[in-house]
Amino acid sequence: HMEERYRLILSTVFNAIGLKVEVEKMIATGRIDMVVQTSRYIYVMELKLRNNGGKSAAVGQIADRQYLEPFKADRRQVIGLGIELDDEGKGLLDWGTAE
């Protein structure tokens, strides 16, 4: 599955540079594709292929399922990222933020 390949690549890169990464994190309202934590930020990432709704579907899912809520009590800034990926393996096409 193409989304899984992208998730593996991204998590490997984030781990390699020393960031804390959680893949397919379960919360009460669903499963977050990836959570990446730095000393100042928490990035909540949803990955969608272009042929599966892309950026707008990813950003919408973060908002609709309230993926940012479990992290709001943390002192760090929480940023939702909806990431659109090419379904033919050509890379990241677009991204947007979710509040």
Ranges and model annotations:
Residues 10, 34-36, 40-51, 65:
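Conserved catalytic cores of phosphodiester-cleaving nucleases, focusing on short active-site segments
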Residues 30-32, 43, 76, 81:
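Structural beta-strand/beta-sheet cores of well-ordered domains, especially the beta-sheet scaffolds
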Residues 13-39:
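Active-site metal-binding core of divalent-cation-utilizing nuclease and nuclease-like domains
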Residues 70, 74-99:
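Domain-level recognition of nuclease-like catalytic cores that cleave nucleotide substrates
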Residues 46, 56, 92-95:
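Short conserved micro-motifs at the rims of enzyme active sites and ligand-binding pockets
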Residues 1-6:
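A short, highly charged nucleic-acid-interacting micro-segment common to nuclease
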